[in-house]
Structures are given as structure tokens and as C-alpha cells.
């Protein structure tokens, strides 16, 4: 296979993508993994489950590209057409592949399922195709050459695709005539916006080196700053840029690579042999969910209390009637008592407690929609802050959950300076 200048195209299939019922995240993942090899996607096409259209598009791609990755259409149903389409474009027949059958037998046996005709459809592959292992799902991938183009077919289920890409990328790397020089460094941040980050860089680092490409990817709750170089000789410049960004953004940087805020918090807690508990009202358990998505979270996360009503705040966490009556559920004394009660009941070292008004209703002149009180810290050393985050309900919950985690991260790291979003989101 030729070097990193090869032309790569993606073909995504499925009516569910065309209709908007499914959001395409797979192409971004594929492009990102290919970028590790210095390979860029120069064209992406999405086509519904139409045989003629799929056949025409794949045929055109194989004439124009060195590598085509097809995503979707590998399952057991009648609208899974990829094997049929590739066989037609390659001018070969369809045959039952023994390795695919063996995979299906093991997959069904492990789940106590019968190996029926619908499942066996997934073993019908283009003649001459090579199986690409799927370590999670029932549908194997497959690949073959069509003329001078290599075609790799992958399943549309995101988790299965992600699991398969490790092997696919390793195989592609072995086939390249020269090792990739492209390097991508990703810095994960919280509390910074794209425009403010760009302005800070422009003001503080006007001599940014041309050989280091700077990019941003906004998300909720994190923002990614991406640095890219295309040749190994630019590695010193990349290191200098990383050091300068770390000095500029400092405590807003969570970590490198794909580090998640919850992952960083758990790592810090594990390193210290300490534990965390959450007490949530307006976020409805989202902080606990973010934490428990991380494997091994039970080593540091003791419990999560979702105390949505005042009655449950009283009964479960011991928030007093007097405090609720005098100050209301969205108040500093209430989140303090929520945090204290949670730590006492879970025997944890640290707590995060949140109570706010997610909207769209429930606001008052004194406490408008978007108002939230956060408490965080250790026993006898709790901190509190009132913020105003007037955004759509689900985004409010995401950002408040992340803010709570961020404050615990800062506490564990001994960071005393306030984050930028404290001044930007200060409630008046």
C-alpha cells in the first residue's frame, strides 16, 4: 500500500442516517483514527439503502480512491446490503465464508442463542474477501481489493466499529511503505470557549509557528485544543507549543488525549486512596452517571444520592425543615447540608452537591432559570458557589455536572485560583 498521500474516501450507508433518526458519529471516529497514520479523508458520501445508488457510488469510489472504508449494512436484515454491493462492484459472487460461520457459532453459543438463517446471512461474503474480526458483535467485517483500491467494510454499530478499528489501523500501519510522521496532540479543557481560547492564544502567542496546525473542537462539557504537525522535524515546535498552552490555560487543562473530566477526578482520588459521594437535585444523577461510565470507578466513587424533592432531601440526607423553609431548595445552606449528609451516610472523603433551576419553568426574580448552588469539598472544608447558567435544560444539567466535577478536581490538585467561568457565570 502506498504512503500517507493515498486518497481515502468513506461511504456510509443506511436510511436511518439519511432520515436523521441516527446521527453519524462513525465517520468522525474513522477520520480521527486514520489521522493517527497521517491519512486524511478527502471525500465522504452517505447513501440510503438503495442498491443502485450504493453500487454506483462504490464503483465510482474504487476508480478514484486508494482506500475506501464502507460503514454500515453488515447485519442480518434485508436492508443490510454491503456484501451484495461490494460483490457486484468487484464482479464476484457471494459465498458462505467458513471463518465468518465460526465467528457466528461462537457468538451465538456465548449468548445461548440459536444460529438461525437470519444470523447466517452475515456469513455470506464476496468471494475472495478477507474477514476483519469483530470482537463484540455478530457481523464480521471484510475487505478486498477492487482494482487498485482496497475496500474495507465495517458495521454501523458505533461500539463495534470502535472495537474493530484498533486492528484495522494496525494493519494499515503495517502496510504503509513509510511510517507516518503526522502527530496529533489533543488537550482536553473545561471552562473555556472556542472564541475566548482563540483570542487568548492570539494575544499571548502571536508568534505561533506555521508548522504547528491549531484547531478546536467544541463540545459539552469539554473543549478540545488540537495541535498537529505533518513531519517529525516539527516535534520540537510541537513540544514548545504544548508548554506555552499549558502555561496560558493552566488549570483549565484536564489532560491530554481523550481524557474525560470524570476520569481525571477518579484517577486523582485513587492516587490518594480517597473516595467521593454525590448528592444531586437538578442534575438528576448525571454526575454519578459520568463517574460510573469509567471502568473501575467503584474504587473511588462510593454512592450517588438523587434527592429531587424536598421530602427526600429531608429523609435521605437530613436537610432540615427550617433550612428548606427559610432559604428554599436552591440555596447555599441546603447544598451544604446535602453534601454533609451524603458524606456522613456514604462514609466518603469528598462530596459534590448541586441544587438548581434547570427550567424552562420554575424561575423567580431572585432565582431565575439557570440558577444553581454547588457545594464541594471534604468534611469540615466545604466550599460553595452560586452560578447562573441560563441554557437549555439538558445542556444546563451537563455543564453543572461537569462544573461540580471540575471543582473537586481543582480541590484535589490544590488549585486555589478561581476558574474563568466563575466570573462569567456569576449570579447577580
Residue ranges and their predicted role:
Residues 8-10, 151, 276:
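Conserved hydrophobic helix-helix packing surfaces used for dimerization/oligomerization
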Residues 143-144, 216-218, 372-378:
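Short beta-strand elements
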Residues 13-15, 70-78, 155-156, 230-231, ...:
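Glycine-rich beta-strand-to-loop/alpha-helix junction loops that act as flexible
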Residues 235-428:
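Short alpha-helical segments enriched in small residues
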Residues 31, 35-60, 96-137, 312-349:
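Glycine-rich oxoanion-binding loops at beta->alpha junctions
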Residues 53-56, 63, 80-176:
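Proline/glycine-rich low-complexity loops and linkers
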Residues 5-45, 236:
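Glycine-rich phosphate/diphosphate-binding loop of Rossmann-like nucleotide-binding domains
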Residues 145-221, 228-230, 236-240:
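Accessory alpha-helical/coil subdomains and C-terminal extensions
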Amino acid at each position: 500500500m502506498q504512503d500517507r498521500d493515498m486518497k481515502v474516501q468513506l461511504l456510509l450507508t443506511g436510511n436511518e442516517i439519511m432520515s436523521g433518526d441516527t446521527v453519524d458519529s462513525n465517520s468522525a471516529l474513522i477520520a480521527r483514527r486514520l489521522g493517527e497514520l497521517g491519512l486524511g479523508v478527502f471525500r465522504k458520501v452517505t447513501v440510503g439503502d438503495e442498491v443502485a445508488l450504493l453500487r454506483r457510488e462504490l464503483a465510482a469510489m474504487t476508480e478514484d480512491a486508494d482506500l475506501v472504508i464502507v460503514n454500515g449494512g453488515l447485519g442480518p436484515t434485508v436492508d443490510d446490503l454491503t456484501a451484495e454491493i461490494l460483490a457486484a462492484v468487484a464482479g464476484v459472487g457471494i459465498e458462505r465464508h467458513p471463518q465468518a460461520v465460526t465467528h457466528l457459532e461462537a457468538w451465538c453459543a456465548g449468548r445461548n442463542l440459536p444460529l438461525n438463517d437470519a444470523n447466517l446471512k452475515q456469513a455470506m461474503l464476496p468471494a475472495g474477501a478477507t474477514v476483519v474480526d469483530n470482537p463484540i458483535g455478530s457481523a464480521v467485517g471484510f475487505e478486498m481489493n477492487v482494482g487498485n483500491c482496497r475496500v474495507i467494510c465495517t458495521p454501523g454499530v458505533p461500539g463495534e466499529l470502535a472495537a474493530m478499528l484498533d486492528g484495522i489501523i494496525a494493519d494499515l500501519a503495517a502496510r504503509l511503505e513509510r511510517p507516518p510522521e503526522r502527530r496529533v496532540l489533543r488537550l482536553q479543557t473545561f471552562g473555556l470557549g472556542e472564541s475566548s481560547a482563540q483570542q487568548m492564544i492570539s494575544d499571548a502567542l502571536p508568534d505561533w509557528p506555521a508548522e504547528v496546525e491549531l484547531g478546536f473542537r467544541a463540545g459539552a462539557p469539554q473543549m478540545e485544543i488540537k495541535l498537529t504537525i505533518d513531519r517529525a522535524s516539527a516535534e520540537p515546535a510541537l513540544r514548545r507549543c504544548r508548554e506555552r498552552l499549558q502555561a496560558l490555560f493552566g488549570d483549565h487543562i484536564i489532560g491530554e488525549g481523550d481524557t474525560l473530566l470524570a476520569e481525571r477526578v477518579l484517577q486523582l482520588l485513587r492516587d490518594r486512596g480517597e473516595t467521593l459521594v454525590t448528592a444531586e437535585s437538578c442534575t438528576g444523577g448525571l454526575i454519578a452517571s459520568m463517574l460510573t461510565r469509567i471502568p473501575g470507578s467503584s474504587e473511588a466513587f462510593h454512592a450517588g444520592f438523587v434527592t429531587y424533592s424536598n421530602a427526600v432531601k429531608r429523609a435521605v440526607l437530613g436537610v432540615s425543615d427550617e433550612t428548606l423553609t427559610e432559604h428554599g431548595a436552591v440555596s447555599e445552606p441546603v447544598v451544604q447540608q446535602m453534601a454533609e449528609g451524603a458524606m456522613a451516610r456514604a462514609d466518603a472523603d469528598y462530596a459534590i452537591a448541586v441544587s438548581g433551576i434547570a427550567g424552562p419553568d420554575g424561575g423567580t426574580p431572585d432565582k431565575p432559570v439557570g440558577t444553581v448552588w454547588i457545594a464541594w469539598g471534604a468534611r469540615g472544608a466545604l466550599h460553595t458557589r452560586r452560578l447562573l447558567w441560563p441554557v437549555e435544560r439538558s445542556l444546563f444539567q451537563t455543564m453543572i455536572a461537569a462544573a461540580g466535577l471540575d471543582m473537586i478536581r481543582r480541590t484535589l490538585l490544590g488549585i486555589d485560583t478561581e476558574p474563568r467561568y466563575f466570573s462569567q457565570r456569576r449570579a447577580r
